[in-house]
């Protein structure tokens, strides 16, 4: 098996997945919305697998509270847009990656236009607020797009209880419950693969807030839990492409 210098970094992946699968990954275009604790890890694992085109979306900047768990967050990146920090990493990982960077808050009315702007082979939903999350899910399913979604990783710590199920089979997850309720009101009851945890959330790890956009509470998190959720999402995308 011969490799050019540019493709040498993919040798181990090709050895496992095979040449045909690698070519499918190179041709694929994956949209990742939400680049926090879960989404950034999902996006990087997808990038490292050799996906050829990606669009990443997140308006947030790196904050001190992100450093305990988020991939783009270190002291030297404080105040910088997460999407831009990750774009630098991804282009350094794969210089041939065709990357579209959108450091914007994805408002509900902008979602249909984004999904119609090009042909996405997979959509990764790692949004942590209910309204835009549900609009993305709704419009992706309406268009017949492949989509996988992350439910809540906060206030939980046991990675052995992480599962992949259909959204309508989730339990012990406040975000899942809110998403189901909103989608039902929107008339959407199609199947949706999600990663969630069967672990009951620790109520003492949740506090009410009123200073964050579209958020009513903040949940305690630990370094590894969102990362594992993100890896679950990436594995699903890579397996299904």
Predicted regions located by residue number:
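N-terminal charged helix/coil linker that caps or initiates catalytic domains
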Residues: 1-30, 64
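Glycine-rich phosphate/adenylate-binding loop
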Residues: 2-4, 118-122, 129-132, 142, ...
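Conserved N-terminal Rossmann-fold NAD(P)-binding element of oxidoreductases
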Residues: 32-34, 57
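Hydrophobic/small residue at the entry helix of a nucleotide-binding pocket
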Residues: 38
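Glycine-rich phosphate-binding loop and adjoining beta1-alpha1-beta2 segment
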Residues: 51, 56-94
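Acidic/polar active-site rim loop that often engages polyanionic ligands
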Residues: 64-72, 155-166
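Short amphipathic alpha-helix with an adjacent loop that forms part of the alpha/beta core around
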Residues: 109-120
């Amino acid at each position: 098996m011969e490799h050019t210098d540019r493709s040498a970094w993919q040798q181990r992946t090709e050895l496992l997945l095979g040449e045909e699968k690698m070519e499918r990954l190179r041709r694929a275009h994956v949209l990742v919305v939400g680049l926090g604790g879960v989404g950034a890890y999902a996006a990087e694992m997808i990038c490292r697998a050799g996906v050829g085109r990606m669009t990443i979306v997140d308006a947030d900047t790196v904050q001190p509270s992100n450093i305990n768990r988020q991939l783009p967050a270190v002291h030297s990146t404080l105040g910088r847009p997460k999407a831009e920090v990750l774009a630098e990493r991804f282009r350094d990982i794969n210089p041939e990656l065709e990357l579209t960077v959108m450091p914007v808050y994805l408002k509900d009315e902008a979602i249909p236009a984004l999904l119609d702007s090009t042909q996405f082979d997979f959509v990764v939903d790692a949004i942590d607020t209910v309204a835009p999350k549900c609009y993305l899910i709704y419009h992706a399913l309406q268009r017949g797009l492949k989509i996988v979604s992350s439910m809540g990783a906060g206030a939980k710590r046991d990675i052995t209880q992480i599962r992949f199920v259909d959204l309508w089979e989730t339990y012990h997850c406040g975000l899942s419950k809110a998403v189901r309720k909103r989608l039902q009101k929107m008339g959407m009851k199609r199947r949706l693969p999600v990663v969630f945890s069967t672990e009951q959330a620790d109520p003492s790890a949740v506090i009410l807030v009123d200073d964050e956009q579209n958020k009513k509470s903040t949940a305690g998190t630990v370094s590894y839990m969102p990362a594992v959720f993100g890896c679950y999402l990436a594995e699903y995308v890579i397996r299904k492409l």
